[in-house]
C-alpha cells in the first residue's frame, strides 16, 4: 500500500511530500525484522536514527522535514503530530493483516472446562496442560508438553498508548505470543502479545513462577528460570539459561546475556553481560553491590 492510500485513516491532516509503498509500521531504534516499513520521527534530535535503518518512508513533523528533505531518499509525509498519524495508520494496518485460522488443540492436550480459549488463531500442542480459568487469546502458539496453571492470561494487548490526556488511545497489538516446548507458567502470569507485527516469545524449557508479567515483544530464551512477581517491560531480551529472582523488574529493551543472574528485588535498567550477576536498585554487578552495602 501507499502513504497516499492510508492518509484517510488519520484524524489529523497528513501532507504527502513524496509517496512510497510499504507493508508494515515499525519503530526506529528497534532491530528491523520486517521489510518495507515506515516509521516516524517527531523531533529533530532523533533524526540520526532514521539513517541507521532501512525504511521505505517516514512520517515526520515540519521541522524534521526541513532537516531531512535534501538527504532522505524515502517517502515523506508531514503531520503536526507525527506520532499520532503513525499509530493511526498502524492501527488501520492491524485490521488488514488479521489472520482467520480455526483454533487447533491437539487431542492429547488436557484443557480445563473453565479455561477460555479464542476460537481463532490459537495453536496448542501435544500433552499441554491448561488449568482452570486460564485465558488464551488470538495469536498464541503453544508448544508441546507445556503447563499453564490457574488464572494465567496469554495474548492480551500490550500496555502501549499514544496521544495525550483524554485523547490517549490504545495501540493495536499486531503481533502474537509464541511459547516453546516444555515451558511452565505458574498461576496468574500475564504474557502480552507483540505490538509491531512481532511476537512475544518464551523459549523451550523455561519456567515462570506465579504472577510474572511478560511485557510485549519480550523474548525469554531457553532454560530460563523466573521467580514470582518478576516483571519484564516491553522489548526485554533474555538469552538462554538466565535466572531472575523474586520481584525483580527489567526495564524496556534491556538485554540480558547468557547465564546471567538477576537478584531478588533488582531493578535492571542497563544491559547485563553474559554470566554476570546484578543486584540492587538500580542494579549493578553483585560484587559491587555487596561492597557498597558493607561500606555503609
Regions found by a protein language model. Give the residues of each.
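Terminal amphipathic alpha-helical/low-complexity segments used for targeting or macromolecular assembly
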Residues: 1-108, 145, 151-152, 156-170, ...
